[in-house]
From Swiss-Prot:
This is ADP-L-glycero-D-manno-heptose-6-epimerase. Catalyzes the interconversion between ADP-D-glycero-beta-D-manno-heptose and ADP-L-glycero-beta-D-manno-heptose via an epimerization at carbon 6 of the heptose. Keywords: Carbohydrate metabolism, Isomerase, NADP. Pathway: Nucleotide-sugar biosynthesis; ADP-L-glycero-beta-D-manno-heptose biosynthesis; ADP-L-glycero-beta-D-manno-heptose from D-glycero-beta-D-manno-heptose 7-phosphate: step 4/4. GO terms for biological process: ADP-L-glycero-beta-D-manno-heptose biosynthetic process; carbohydrate metabolic process. Substrate binds at residues 170, 181, 188, 202-205, 216, 281. It comes from Nitratidesulfovibrio vulgaris (strain ATCC 29579 / DSM 644 / CCUG 34227 / NCIMB 8303 / VKM B-1760 / Hildenborough) (Desulfovibrio vulgaris). The gene is hldD.
Length: 323
């Protein structure tokens, strides 16, 4: 049995899609659907059971999972970088993850955890996923800090020898529609361009970057789940790994790709960055991918223009945009 926490969410539901693509349906989806639209991410998927997050947490707390579990893909977390409730993040992103990791270690189940590139803070220490760098990182927001604390705990307790914790960079692609303000700029741009014919980006607050010239490592969600599938097949590959393309691109590049995919000429306007984001905004991110490559991962990452074109034309423009 495979358990996917956050299985109705963005990357989680994409992982359920990948498992289905590989002929696997013995899947338990763990999530908190509440009043969100996440349920739509599951309509096309095949799995044996859905368990509410709180019920699952009780099972984990008592060490009493009613399945013979092969692997847990732990994508369940609060992923809002703007979340300000630190106690909630500590409980949801740290304590819950530690308990689940311990249970997997005890039972021999494969454990793959979602960390984040938000752990790298302002990037002044670079974006290396080696353990020495990890010890010195200073995240800019509480979300990144909660993810950093799990990785530090796993390192300190010797758990990184038996799990994979993945620092996802800027992920985009189908099944992110429920995320509101946390949707990728591609998803937002498609709607804004369709309605107004223009896309607005934040002006740069960094003297080294022009407006729209801030750079991020954008990775297609299908590539993320390919990496996780490979890790499931290679349980001896463990540690903290970056999951990005290793090639930073500008916001202008990204938005231009959306315009091109929509067969429109780019029209970009720049607006002031909200006060609450200033000082907490990463102007540059680029994954160092040597560690994952050296471990033997063969996944070839999709070029930005190709990923954006597929996302726009195959999904965003479709009657059913879901995987």
């Amino acid at each position: 049995m495979y358990i996917v926490t956050g299985g109705a969410g963005f990357i989680g539901s994409a992982m359920v899609w990948k498992l289905n693509e590989m002929g696997i349906e013995d899947i338990v989806v763990v999530d908190n659907l509440s009043t969100s639209e996440k349920w739509k991410n599951l309509v096309n998927r095949r799995y044996v059971d859905y368990v509410h997050r709180d019920t699952f947490m009780d099972m984990v707390l008592h060490g009493d999972l009613p399945w013979d579990v092969d692997a847990v893909v732990h994508m369940g977390a609060c992923s809002a970088t703007t979340e300000r409730d630190a106690d909630f993040l500590m409980e949801n992103n740290l304590r819950y993850s530690r308990m689940l990791c311990e249970l997997c270690m005890e039972t021999g189940a494969r454990f793959i955890n979602a960390s984040s590139a938000a752990t790298y803070g302002d990037g002044s220490l670079g974006f290396s996923d080696d353990d020495t760098t990890m010890l010195r990182l200073k995240p800019l927001n509480m979300y990144g800090y909660s993810k950093q604390l799990f990785d530090l705990w796993a390192y300190r307790e010797g758990r990184l020898d038996g799990i994979a914790s993945l620092k996802f960079f800027n992920v985009y692609g189908p099944n992110e529609y429920h995320k509101g303000d946390m949707r990728s700029v591609i998803c937002k741009a498609y709607a804004q361009i369709g309605q107004e014919g223009v896309m607005r980006l934040f002006r740069s607050c960094h003297p080294d970057y022009a407006d729209g010239g801030q750079m991020r490592d954008f990775i297609y969600v299908k590539d993320c789940v390919e990496v996780m599938w490979w890790l499931l097949q290679n349980p001896g590959v463990n540690g903290v790994f970056n999951v990005g393309t290793g090639k930073a691109r500008t916001w202008n590049d990204l938005v231009t790709a959306v315009f091109r995919a929509m067969d429109r000429e780019p029209v970009i306007e720049y607006i002031d960055m909200p006060e609450q984001l200033r000082g907490k905004y990463q102007s540059f991110t680029e994954a160092t991918m040597g560690k994952l490559r050296d471990a033997g991962c063969p996944v070839r990452f999709t070029e930005l223009e190709d990923g954006v074109t597929e996302y726009v034309r195959r999904y965003l423009a479709a009657a059913d945009p879901h995987l």
